[in-house]
Amino acid sequence: MVISVPLFSSVLLALVVAVPADFDVGGRLLGVGLCSVRGDPNEHYDPHGDLYLRPFLQLDSVHQFYSLVFARKASSAMGASTSTKRPLTSKVTNEGENDRVKYASSAMQGLRMSMQDALAVELDLDALKSTSFFGVYDGHGGAEVAMYCAKRFHVMLREEESFLNNLSYAITSVCSRLDDELEAPNVWRASLYPHRSSESSSESSDCFQFLSTGSCANVWRSSEAVSYKLPSYEGSTACVVIIRGNQITVGNVGDSRCVLSKNGQAIDLSTDHKPNVPLERQRILRVGGQVWREKFPAKDSGGEIREQWGPYCIEGKLSTSRALAGIFLTTISGDFAYKNIVYRPQYQMVTHFPDIRVAKITGDTEFLVIASDGICSIQILIVDLNTFFPFRDHMSSQDVVDFVHEKLNSRRQELCQSLINQGKKRECFTEDSQLATNKNIAPNTTTLGEETLHTTCEKLVENCLESRNNATAILVQFKPGADQPIPALPNIQEGSDEVAGGADQPIPVLPNIQQVSDEVAGGTGQPIPVLPDIQEGSDEVAGGAAVAEQHQHNPEGGGEQQLDLDDALDGEALALLFGQP
């Protein structure tokens, strides 16, 4: 039987429209179908209705297929965007504080078709030990893995036996456990959507299963059993910060970023995991993967069409080399199509193995920023030949610090001028308010107020609208006294190194520790040591049962240097690292 394209599309459209579009499922997409549209699809867009069209497939010059998506009218800023030309600039912003820090977080969907970023904040994750938690999760292929990580990461971290004594090991263990949970049948997805009750049989609970491939739309009742599918091409990065006393511990998987400001100088506490980074590329190629980039057509300012190189991607699909989930390519969680069970987690094309760095809060520590790649990474802007979108380079870590400083200082100057106008010039220049004239002094006075952080964080996110990506940031400001240590925890002396290792390793891996610039990473009994990324000016050592290499690189893909392990660690140091007498 032959079904004509117009008839086929009409049947699909009728099927989709027949489903009610007003049932409440918490603001998420209600369904998707296929329809054929003649002419300009924007003519079929109702900005005030429940439906919008998403380009899907063009068969010829007449029949163009679009996915017809049901969405709630009163959707939040985290809902689906209608078009790349209709940015969602509304933001979800929060703030809070305890006796050591104050924070503001902001997230904006921007020009993306959907919001796939998520974040989590726990100011008092462990009140007895003065522990605060902040995390940014940048999803790809969908938002569900990022949402699950935001819901579970800090909870699982608190459950770790090593949480009180070894944060580095605890973070690494949580990444492995999260990846394992994503393979569990339906459990993790069910926790995201508790309204999907297996006992419900009402017809109003029928909904569509949205497939990210866009190939079809399945209709099922929530009371029916649905076979579980691994999030093959869905995953999330994770950049988590744990502040305990005067110590900052950062765990990073993927291309989100954490940057610390000291006296106005940016200090990277994470490294972007990109496929073209030499160490990442080496791991990918070793297990049979490929890394390449493609050219995209674009219009320049003169209206001429030109080609621009896109980002390096694994298998031409994934632009981050570490994340959660996956089996062929891996990211912090998900991407099971990129993972191979033959290899250990450290050696996957896309691995969930985190980099851990530790820094101390000192008197000149001002604030830190955790941001998704919508703020800090290079973005490809031109996808529409009918409209000119200039290519936007990334904000460097120093750019981010300078931006925050500028906004906070302008607020101080306004407050100072206001005091002067009120005849209180003397108060403006007291010891606590000299910040009005010196941008390098930590902005810790209560004069600034939470509104300043709130506004600054929102402006930082809004500044990255041109990246055509979701933008999420957490701005954490340190209060006076934040540099004071808490009583030493059991088995950890002040100034001692923590040991970071994999969750499945009975003997801890060599420390993956950085006191701002020095890192030591490696494994025991591992034939191929996987080294963390190397930052400019840092010294890293990879240790194993046999020999280790140190690789240094630059963004241009520079040469490698070797370091003899004996020159870095003597017998006494090795005994200390392995816990031997």
Curated annotation (Swiss-Prot):
GO biological process assignments: signal transduction
Q: Which family does it belong to?
A: Belongs to the PP2C family.
Main EC class of this protein?
hydrolase
Give the signal peptide range: 1-21
Entry-linked CDD domains: PP2Cc
What EC number(s) does its UniProt record assign? 3.1.3.16
Q: Does the keyword Cytoplasm apply?
A: no
- Pfam families assigned to the protein according to its UniProt record, in alphabetical order: PP2C (PF00481)
Record flagged with keyword Lyase? no
Taxonomically, the superkingdom here is Eukaryota
Binding annotation for Mn(2+) 2: D138, D373, N469
Reaction catalysis annotation: O-phospho-L-seryl-[protein] + H2O = L-seryl-[protein] + phosphate; O-phospho-L-threonyl-[protein] + H2O = L-threonyl-[protein] + phosphate
In residue numbers, the region (Disordered) covers: 538-563
Q: Which SUPFAM superfamilies match?
A: PP2C-like (SSF81606)
Q: What is this protein called?
A: Putative protein phosphatase 2C 22
